[in-house]
Curated annotation (Swiss-Prot):
Topological type in the membrane: Peripheral membrane protein
HAMAP family: UbiD
EC annotation from Swiss-Prot or TrEMBL: 4.1.1.98
Reaction equations catalysed: a 4-hydroxy-3-(all-trans-polyprenyl)benzoate + H(+) = a 2-(all-trans-polyprenyl)phenol + CO2
GO molecular function: 3-octaprenyl-4-hydroxybenzoate carboxy-lyase activity; metal ion binding
Source taxonomy: Bacteria, Pseudomonadati, Pseudomonadota, Gammaproteobacteria, Legionellales
GO terms classed as biological process: ubiquinone biosynthetic process
Role, per record: Catalyzes the decarboxylation of 3-octaprenyl-4-hydroxy benzoate to 2-octaprenylphenol, an intermediate step in ubiquinone biosynthesis.
Subcellular location: Cell membrane
Gene (UniProt): ubiD
Cofactor names: prenylated FMN; Mn(2+)
Subunit field text: Homohexamer.
Name of the molecule in the record: 3-octaprenyl-4-hydroxybenzoate carboxy-lyase
Length: 488
């Protein structure tokens, strides 16, 4: 599905009955979480709350509440087509050398398409139709959700944060939650390994006493949001990739108060800065693990300016024990990851991040095993190849006769093909999600790899068991007279 911006996407969802307008008054304080959660768990539509008590803005939730809508946001019609996006990314990340003159020409359309999707810079953008400055800046006028009873304050959840490190031309996009502190202040919660935090660290080293410019987009088009969480190659900007997904170039405009660029069609933009050394305790908040996280200090984001479209839409979500919207997003992106992994490791048959494992903390991989120790190589590959798997705590590797998405198959393989001592790999002192309170040190913990493949000579001295299978001729013969047995 092709679309121009968030409003066009909403209109097309509504025409397909994939979005429901809620005219009954529903509060962003806890109530929207209950409604959104019930609808998501039933596989229901995206929701547009048009009657938000005490606020003038409608609230959009559950935009990516089904895999189908994630696929539509990526310009496709089904989850199956997401594999093609993964193949495109794999080709752009590590293009195969042409096999000849004819093959070189066949690769040109792909390269040309990527180059032609460079962002288009415009002035007079829709997102700057209205400007709040100085005393007009008031974040409390936005219908920011309070998602759970134990949350310390309202929380921006779909803020698309744009930063740029010193001496860099490329801007970084990331999605980081932001706690409301006051009318013009938020807390920017980003992990130290993420792009925005790395830009800020580099800025502090270069300009230790200068303010760090930041822009936050609320209500970007789906392709831009999804590009921010997809492993886009360093040779391609997230905005160019969003253009590829959307089928048209991303329109960007320069912020009024700094040199950063934001989507021209965004609903709301927050412009401001981080002051080196200015931090505040963030949390607790209920998060995607199903628990409240501990309180930690993060930088304070001072908002100098709010710009927005006519009648802006506030885009929000909640996070909690799966399934939630990030978990659904993870299921869809799983299909994008597979071709990327297979490009580098062709022996991988399937790769699965179970949503109940918080979408990234556990991975199951099936391979065509080729030599002793092969499973351990794949474990290391998963942990190191894509930064999205930096926080994956458990990797289970199975043979290709196992269905990676069927726990009965996986547990059977683990309990029949594993010796706990021989087939378990432990790696200590590795990067771990700060939200993982089970790790002994915040941000640092261990990883476990489990080799549930059949063992080859060199891995065992015993005769290995042969799986039981029925004779195919007998199966076909019985199936031929099955209907005559009077059995269902």
């Amino acid at each position: 599905m092709k679309y121009s911006d968030l409003r066009d996407f909403i209109a097309q969802l509504e025409s397909r009955e994939l979005l429901k307008r809620i005219d009954y008054p529903v509060s962003p304080h806890l109530e929207m979480t209950v409604v959104s959660d019930k609808v998501l768990r039933s596989g229901g539509p995206a929701l547009l709350f048009t009657n938000t008590p005490n606020y003038d803005m409608p609230v959009l939730t559950n935009l990516f509440g089904t895999v189908e809508r994630v696929a539509l946001g990526m310009g496709e019609e089904s989850i199956v087509a997401l594999r093609e996006i993964g193949k495109l990314l794999a080709a752009l990340k590590e293009p195969d050398p042409p096999k000849g003159f004819k093959d070189a020409f066949s690769k040109l359309p792909l390269l040309k398409q990527a180059l032609n999707m460079a962002p288009k810079y415009v002035s007079g953008a829709e997102c700057q139709t209205h400007v709040w400055e100085k005393d007009e800046v008031d974040l409390t006028l936005l219908p920011i959700q309070t998602c759970w009873p134990g949350d310390v304050a309202p929380l921006i959840t779909w803020g698309l944060v744009t930063t740029r490190g010193p001496h860099q031309s490329r801007e970084n996009m990331g999605i980081y939650r932001q706690q409301l502190l006051s009318k013009n202040k938020l807390i920017m919660r980003w992990l130290s390994h993420r792009g925005g935090a790395l830009d800020y660290q580099a800025w502090q080293q270069e300009y230790p006493k200068e303010r760090f410019p930041v822009a936050v987009t609320l209500g970007a088009d789906p392709a831009t949001i999804l590009a921010a969480v997809t492993p886009v190659p360093d040779t391609l900007s997230e905005y160019a990739f969003a253009g590829l997904l959307r089928g048209q170039r991303t329109r960007l405009t320069r912020c009024i108060g700094n040199d950063l660029h934001v989507p021209a069609s965004a609903e709301i933009v927050l412009e401001g800065y981080l002051e080196p050394g200015n931090e505040a305790p963030e949390g607790p908040y209920g998060d995607h693990t199903g628990y409240y996280n501990e309180v930690q200090s993060f930088p304070v984001f001072t908002v100098e300016r709010i710009t927005h479209r006519d009648k802006p839409i506030y885009h929000s979500t909640y996070t909690g024990r799966p399934p939630d919207e990030p978990a659904i997003l993870g299921v869809a992106l799983n299909e994008v990851f597979i071709p990327l992994l297979q490009k580098q490791f062709p022996e991988i048959v399937d790769f699965y991040l179970p949503p109940e494992g918080c979408s990234y903390r556990l991975a199951v991989v099936t391979i065509k095993k080729q030599y002793p120790g092969h499973a351990k190589r794949i474990m290391m590959a998963v942990w190191s190849f894509l930064r999205q798997f930096m926080y994956t705590k458990f990797v289970i590797v199975c043979d290709d006769d196992v269905d990676a998405r069927n726990w009965q198959d996986v547990i059977w393989a683990m309990t029949t093909r594993m010796d706990p001592s021989r087939d378990t790999v432990m790696v200590e002192n590795t990067p771990i999600d700060y939200l993982d309170f089970a790790s002994p040190v915040s941000g640092l913990g261990s990883k476990m790899g489990m080799d549930a493949t059949s063992k080859w000579p060199g891995e065992t001295q015993r005769e290995w068991g042969k799986p039981i299978t029925m004779d195919e001729d007998v199966l076909n013969r019985v199936n031929g007279y099955w209907s005559l047995l009077g059995l269902k």
